[in-house]
Regions:
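A structural motif corresponding to the C-terminal end of an alpha-helix
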Residues: 4-13, 71-77, 163-166, 196-201
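C-terminal domain-boundary segment and adjacent tail
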Residues: 104, 154-221
Length: 221
């Protein structure tokens, strides 16, 4: 996404990037720029062409570990979050994530709040993600316009904002720059983001900031 089209920068929002580790080799400047902006990088397999649930247990473990190691080498920091390509896991994925180092995973799209998972006696957090407020299924697959997508974002926010008055809610807006970042769409996203950040009490946070806050709250579920 070109800097002049980057709504998050204008509105003081830092993103959490689902990063294929191959990007560290193929497009290192992208990774360097994200780090310089203070954005968070979470593991997203080595490539979107790889799906963990189709691998042998040995290959899956190797991919999870190699992904985290390559991102750490490129950024100096082990990724704290993970999103599997296609949100596809095997029965072993969570065990390998605990071994590799991430503290949260975004594959489980079943709640609007974080929650803890017991993985072999170790703690791993689930963080809210969305396949609804997501430009790929809505714009590319369902053929919705950017204005329709903006209305979806606003309605999602309004509901979660009301509910959040009693107990905090997490709203994920899941984007792909090659979709939302084109000239005829970016204005709709910018408008939606401006609407959200001007509401009182909204906290634009990265994935790890959300999880740190959740754990510090004393939550046990």
């Amino acid at each position: 996404m070109k800097p002049q089209r980057s709504g998050p920068l204008r509105h003081g929002v830092r993103g959490t990037v689902a990063l294929n580790s191959e990007v560290c080799d193929d497009y290192p400047q992208v990774v360097e720029d994200a780090v310089a902006l203070g954005w968070e990088l979470m593991g997203h397999n080595q490539s979107n062409a790889l799906y963990l649930h189709l691998m042998s247990a040995e290959e899956e473990r190797r991919v999870v570990l190699a992904t985290c190691e390559r991102i750490e080498k490129a950024t100096g920091r082990r990724p704290r979050g993970w999103l599997s390509s296609g949100l596809q896991e095997s029965w072993h994925t969570l065990d390998y994530l605990v071994e590799a180092g991430p503290t949260y995973v975004a594959d489980w799209i079943n709640d609007d709040q974080p929650y803890l998972m017991n993985v072999g006696g170790q703690r791993l957090c689930s963080i809210p993600y969305s396949v609804e407020i997501n430009d790929l299924p809505q714009i590319l697959r369902a053929g919705r316009s950017s204005d329709e997508f903006e209305r979806m974002i606003r309605r999602q926010f309004d509901t979660l904002y009301r509910e959040g008055a009693k107990s905090g809610r997490v709203m994920a807006i899941c984007l792909h720059p090659f979709i939302i970042g084109v000239p005829h769409r970016i204005g709709a996203f910018d408008s939606a983001l401006a609407y959200i950040v001007r509401q009182e009490g909204v906290w634009p946070a990265t994935g790890s900031e959300i999880i740190e806050h959740y754990l510090a709250s004393g939550a046990t579920f």
